[in-house]
């Protein structure tokens, strides 16, 4: 029997039923009609679709360097504090391990991520990809970058058909993401985004929303629209034990949730060709929130293997649990930590998540954010919980009032109306 949750909407006598893989709207229904629909959904069969492509793919994430040319006021990794880069031989051992672990894999899904600016040591990055190309038929390059690279770097990303996530805070860039010298980085990043878009690059923009910028989401959207951005992710600034900056940078979760709803409505009502990834609305499922608990394998400049980029140094809090191995002469995995991380699931999370009506959408929120806020054992984050409980009923209600909102929120919504 399927688990089904019932979410009451702001519209009277209207509900959303969620079960893994599906959202069902019940509009203007009686209590008996609601109970009948719940029982019917509980008794439907689960459609299990096997993704055969996974059998031929493996993945690896790399933090190429801790060095960074920006000094973002909220940096989760305090990038630029050190300038050491990963050793190419460490990377080769990791790539060899991934090939040996799954010899049938023809595709390597390779992520270049921060700790610093991944593309700053461009020669090293090219050497990494060239080696991966020798072992795999196809290497999919995924990059999270601050977007300050040279034309040579941008052209390489275009030629590699990379999936590019550019961190750009738009109207807040000068205040929040200056160069290490203090110079404004806005124009160089904006121009690089325009260049990538003009060459049909696969690009999305990520905006970090602070207490300074939470009231400027519409201004951000207008600038992104003007330069042709089609996909943006709004990410709240969540300060941690290792990030740069003051706790006051974190926005009020209630204001953030309200402004998120407002900007989605603005995009829908003004026919702006922009999709918004909120991180707070997703296809209902029952798995782990992210790969931290289920397979993340990220190598660091210290030759460590971490399950989360927010813990990338051996001396950082929770590294004794979040690090899953190290690379010396070979890859050495910590099976105890791997087993521990598998338990980072909302069903094991303190705070009532296992009974919450939003659990299939929220999945308990980012486990590392929960740990930063509350330590261990895993306990729900109040920030995430407040946002979800304000945002979801509002946005689910507005979806039935304005179907354009669905197109802003999700590419292929699994929604039924009854």
Where in this protein do the model-derived segments appear?
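N-terminal [4Fe-4S]-dependent radical SAM core
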Residues: 1-61, 104-105, 418
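A broadly conserved sequence feature marking short terminus-proximal activation segments
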Residues: 30-43, 299-334
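Short, flexible, mixed-charge glycine/proline-rich loop motifs
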Residues: 52, 65-66, 344-348
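Canonical Radical SAM [4Fe-4S] cluster-binding loop centered on the CxxxCxxC motif
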Residues: 54-90
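Radical SAM/AdoMet-radical enzyme domain recognition
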Residues: 92-113, 121-237, 249-251
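Radical SAM enzyme [4Fe-4S]-AdoMet core and its adjacent flexible, acidic
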Residues: 177-190, 194, 198-293, 298-306, ...
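Flexible mid-to-C-terminal extensions adjoining Fe-S/redox cofactors in radical SAM and related proteins
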Residues: 315-418
């Amino acid at each position: 029997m399927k688990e089904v949750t019932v979410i009451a909407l702001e519209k009277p006598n209207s509900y959303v039923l969620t079960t893994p893989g599906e959202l069902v709207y019940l509009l203007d229904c009686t209590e008996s009609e609601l109970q009948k629909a719940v029982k019917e959904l509980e008794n439907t069969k689960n459609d299990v679709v096997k993704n055969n492509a996974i059998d031929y793919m493996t993945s690896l994430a790399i933090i190429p360097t801790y060095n960074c040319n920006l000094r973002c006021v909220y940096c989760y990794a305090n990038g630029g504090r050190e300038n050491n880069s990963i050793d190419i031989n460490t990377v080769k051992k990791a790539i060899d391990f991934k090939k040996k672990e799954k010899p049938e894999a023809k595709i390597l899904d390779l992520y270049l991520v921060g700790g610093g600016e991944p593309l700053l040591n461009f020669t090293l990055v090219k050497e990494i990809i060239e080696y991966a190309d020798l072992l795999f038929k196809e290497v999919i390059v995924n990059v999270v970058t601050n977007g300050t690279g040279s034309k040579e770097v941008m052209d390489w990303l275009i030629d590699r058909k990379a999936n590019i996530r550019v961190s750009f805070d738009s109207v807040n860039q000068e205040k929040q993401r200056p160069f290490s010298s203090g110079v404004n980085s806005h124009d160089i990043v904006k121009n690089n985004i325009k260049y990538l878009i003009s060459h049909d690059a696969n690009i999305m923009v990520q905006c970090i929303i602070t207490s300074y910028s939470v009231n400027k989401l519409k201004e951000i959207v207008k600038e992104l629209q003007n330069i042709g951005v089609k996909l943006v992710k709004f990410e709240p600034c969540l300060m941690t034990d290792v990030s740069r900056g003051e706790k006051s940078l974190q926005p009020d979760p209630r204001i953030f949730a309200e402004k998120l709803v407002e900007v989605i409505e603005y995009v829908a009502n003004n026919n702006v060709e922009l999709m918004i990834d909120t991180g707070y609305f997703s296809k209902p499922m029952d798995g782990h929130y992210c790969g931290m608990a289920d397979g993340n394998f990220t190598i660091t400049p210290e030759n460590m293997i971490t399950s989360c980029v927010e813990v990338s140094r051996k001396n950082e809090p929770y590294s004794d649990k979040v690090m899953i191995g190290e690379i010396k002469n070979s890859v050495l995995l910590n099976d105890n930590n791997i087993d521990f991380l598998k338990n980072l699931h909302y069903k094991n999370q303190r705070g009532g998540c296992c009974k919450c009506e939003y659990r299939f959408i929220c999945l308990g929120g980012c486990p590392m954010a929960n740990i930063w806020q509350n330590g261990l054992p895993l306990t729900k984050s109040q920030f995430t919980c407040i946002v979800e409980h304000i945002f979801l009923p509002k946005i689910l209600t507005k979806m039935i009032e304005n179907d354009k909102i669905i197109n802003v929120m999700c590419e292929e919504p699994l929604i039924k109306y009854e």
